[in-house]
C-alpha cells in the first residue's frame, strides 16, 4: 500500500491555473510549478503525468468552475448591456480568469485537446450572448468577441476602449 498523497490535488490544480494564466504554458516551467504548488516533482508527474497533463486539468477546472457557471449566469441577464457588464466584471476577477484566453492564444491551434476545451468554453459564452441578444444582426457575436478582446488588451497592458465605453455602445445597439 502506497503512502497517502502529500498534497491537495484540487488546490494544486487551482494554483497551477493561476500560474498558467499569468505566465502562459511555455513561460511556466516544471520548476515553477514545483515551487508554486509546493509539491515534489515526482508527485506532480505521478498524479498528472506531465506538465501538459496538469495544464489540461487546470483548464478543465477553469471551465467547470468559472467559465461554464459564468455562461449559465449570463443567460439570465436582462439585455445585452447587463450581460456585457456582468461579463466584463467576471473577467476582471483575478489571474485565473485569463486562462481561457491564454489557452486560446497560446495552445489551442497546436494542441487538439486544448483546442476542444477552448472551443467548449467559447461556445458556452457565445451561446449565452446569443440567447440574450438574439443573433439576427450579428451583435451577439461581436459582443462576445469584445469581452474577450477587452480581457486580451488588459493582459497585454494595451490601451483601448474602457469597459464603460463598451457598455455605452452595447446600450446604444442593444
What are the residue ranges of the model-derived segments?
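N-terminal intrinsically disordered/low-complexity leader segments
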Residues: 1-7, 171
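Helix-turn-helix
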Residues: 10-11, 15-58
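An amphipathic alpha-helix signature
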Residues: 13, 81, 85, 123-130, ...
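Hydrophobic alpha-helical connector segments
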Residues: 57, 68-98, 143
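Short, basic, alpha-helical segments at the C-terminal edge of helix-turn-helix-like DNA-binding modules
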Residues: 60-66
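Amphipathic alpha-helical segments used for helix-helix packing
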Residues: 85, 92-122
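Short alpha-helical scaffolding segments that buttress acidic/His motifs in well-ordered protein cores
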Residues: 87, 100-105, 143-150
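Hydrophobic/aromatic-rich alpha-helical bundle segments in the mid-to-C-terminal region
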Residues: 112-123, 132-174
Amino acid at each position: 500500500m502506497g503512502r497517502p498523497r502529500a498534497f491537495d490535488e484540487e488546490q494544486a490544480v487551482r494554483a497551477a491555473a493561476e500560474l498558467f494564466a499569468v505566465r502562459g504554458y511555455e513561460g511556466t516551467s516544471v520548476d515553477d510549478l514545483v515551487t508554486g504548488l509546493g509539491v515534489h516533482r515526482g508527485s506532480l508527474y505521478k498524479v498528472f503525468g506531465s506538465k501538459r497533463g496538469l495544464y489540461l486539468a487546470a483548464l478543465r477546472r477553469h471551465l467547470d468552475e468559472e467559465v461554464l457557471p459564468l455562461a449559465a449566469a449570463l443567460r439570465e441577464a436582462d439585455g445585452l448591456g447587463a450581460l456585457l457588464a456582468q461579463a466584463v466584471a467576471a473577467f476582471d476577477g483575478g489571474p485565473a480568469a485569463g486562462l481561457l484566453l491564454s489557452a486560446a492564444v497560446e495552445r489551442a491551434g497546436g494542441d487538439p485537446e486544448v483546442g476542444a476545451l477552448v472551443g467548449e468554453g467559447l461556445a458556452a459564452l457565445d451561446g449565452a450572448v446569443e440567447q440574450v441578444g438574439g443573433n439576427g444582426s450579428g451583435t451577439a457575436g461581436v459582443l462576445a468577441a469584445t469581452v474577450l478582446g477587452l480581457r486580451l488588451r488588459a493582459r497585454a497592458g494595451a490601451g483601448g476602449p474602457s469597459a464603460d465605453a463598451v457598455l455605452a455602445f452595447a446600450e446604444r445597439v442593444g
